[in-house]
Amino acid sequence: EAERSKENALGLLMKQALEGVVAVPWTLMLDKWRMAVFDGSLNEEELNDYWWELRKKYQGVESPIDRPDDAFDPGAKYHIPGNTPYTRYYLARVLQYQFHEALCESMSFEGDLHECSIYSNDEAGLRLRNMLAMGQSQPWPDALETITGQRTLSGKSLLNYYAPLKEWLDEQNRNRACGW
């Protein structure tokens, strides 16, 4: 029964990671490409090649076919022609886990971070409410500090949340060549 429970937890973590964690390099890559366009470091002929260079570097994927010289694959993502920054999605992912870990710590939770629930916890609710009540009246580092005790963003909480999954994946992939 304990083994089945562990498998269920790993399955849930895998599902969550495939929905959320894989978005982190995509969101970073997309705005890195946008910034290179805006700062003028790319000419028109390099736009698509640089897109695929970043996709390979950050996501480990390549175009399934050779791309013609006039291809503009970035335009398929509506945020590109719509000139919509994507950094907000990157920050949201990082902050989601940072907030969760801080709120779990505020209620003295002990255990794997993915098992913590802040539901109906008065202390966690008060911290979250106090931060949200600030609205735009304070700089964001002040709001972050209210809930986390820190003034900087950190990806450590994301790593802590998925630590059991990473441990399992490391074991499954032992003696295998993984990566790009």
What label would you give each PLM region?
Residues 3, 7, 11-13, 19-180:
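C-terminal, non-catalytic "cap/extension" segments appended to globular domains
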